[in-house]
Amino acid sequence: MGQKTHPLGFRLGITQEHRSAWYANFNQYANLLKEDNQIRTYLNKLAKTASISNIQINRNGLSDQIQLNIETGRPGVLVGENGTGIKTLLSNIKKILPPNRQLTINIIEVEKVNLNASLIGDLVVEQLEDRVAFRKAIRKAMQSALDENVNGIKIQVSGRLNGAEIARSEWIREGRVPLQTLRADIDYATKEAHTIYGVLGVKVWLFKSEILAK
């Protein structure tokens, strides 16, 4: 039986970079990993309203400095009026961390939201939760990406589609999505839509281009 490999993990070091960049001594590793997970869990709760697409955590060697790079399609939502939002964000994340940690947050705007698998997934989820038919929701999201001249896109929705009694999976693809080609710059994201019929799973594969000289 065929096994599917995660498109991003498969390309680490080739077209993708690690989402956390740090090293630690053996006795510290578990605690730092737990800190990363707590930070991501907190930020993922804000992901839908703030359109957060990626969270990059960098630590400066064995010191207590943490640099948090947040890529978002709506930077104004995170920053807030007169920077109040970013101050609240900084304060809430520091509550998760030990008192000796020094935290820096960089907000990075995603310029082309229709070329980002995570933000396309958010668009599909938003429509599904508004009770739009799943095929219509997929087509609308795909068209927004195709207007940006991507090489290919595939979107899959799983669950009780349109309120059906039996759960199933359906997908639509436009263009090429070469998952076995390592030089292919594939963006991938998974999302959940909470509807009155239950939870629907959404997966988005986005083939941007081939990277030949990396």
Curated annotation (Swiss-Prot):
PROSITE patterns linked to this entry: KH_TYPE_2, RIBOSOMAL_S3
Localization terms from the record: Plastid, Chloroplast
Assigned keywords, A-Z: Chloroplast, Plastid, Ribonucleoprotein, Ribosomal protein, RNA-binding, rRNA-binding
Primary localization class, coarse: plastid
Any one biological process term the GO annotation gives: translation
Pfam family name, one: Ribosomal_S3_C
Domain KH type-2, chain residue ranges per copy: 39-111
Annotated GO CC locations: chloroplast; cytosolic small ribosomal subunit
GO molecular function, one term: rRNA binding
Protein family membership: Belongs to the universal ribosomal protein uS3 family.
Subunit structure, interactors included: Part of the 30S ribosomal subunit.
Protein name as it appears in the record: Small ribosomal subunit protein uS3c
Organism the protein comes from: Trieres chinensis (Marine centric diatom)
Record gene name: rps3
